[in-house]
């Protein structure tokens, strides 16, 4: 029996007045029913493996701001992509770390077909054709000022 009285303000009513003395939790009682009504499911199909790429050979360079994460040379990036595919991860996202000597005000090195990210994309796709590769065409790794855009008269355009 519900003892709800409209005269009471909402904040003054307790749970029993709203639902009765019984709280219906039957959908959460057993594992099978919780799984049936679950709204979100996270699986390996939802994962994207980030790979940070640098020039060179056989080098793992720690990223101080992300403990346990490394910048990898192309050869090691390919191995990580192979590892991701073996684990069933459908895609990787690659992020370049471009040497300062290759950066300029306009990020022109991004257009070089032989830049580190373009070479990494080709090498990974050749070695692991079934994996998706997500690349970012951001300018910040390629500009000397580090902004994700072209800087003109102190304004990013």
Predicted regions and their residues:
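N-terminal amphipathic alpha-helix/helix-capping segment at the start of soluble metabolic enzymes
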Residues: 2-60, 64
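N-terminal small/glycine-rich loop or linker at the start of catalytic domains
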Residues: 42-69, 134-157
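Short, well-ordered coil/turn segments that N-cap beta-strands
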Residues: 44-47, 88-91, 128-131
């Amino acid at each position: 029996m519900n003892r709800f009285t409209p005269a009471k303000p909402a904040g003054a009513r307790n749970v029993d007045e709203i639902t009765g003395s019984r709280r219906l939790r039957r959908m959460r009682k057993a594992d099978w029913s919780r799984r049936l009504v679950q709204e979100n499911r996270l699986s390996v199909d939802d994962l994207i493996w980030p790979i940070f790429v640098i020039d060179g050979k056989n080098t793992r360079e720690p990223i101080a701001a992300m403990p346990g994460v490394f910048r990898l040379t192309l050869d090691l990036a390919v191995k990580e992509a192979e590892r991701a595919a073996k684990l069933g991860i459908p895609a990787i996202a690659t992020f370049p770390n471009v040497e300062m000597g290759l950066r300029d005000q306009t990020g022109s090195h991004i257009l070089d077909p032989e830049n580190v990210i373009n070479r990494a994309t080709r090498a990974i796709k050749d070695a692991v054709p079934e994996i998706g590769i997500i690349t970012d065409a951001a300018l910040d790794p390629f500009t000397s000022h580090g902004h994700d855009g072209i800087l003109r008269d102190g304004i990013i355009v």
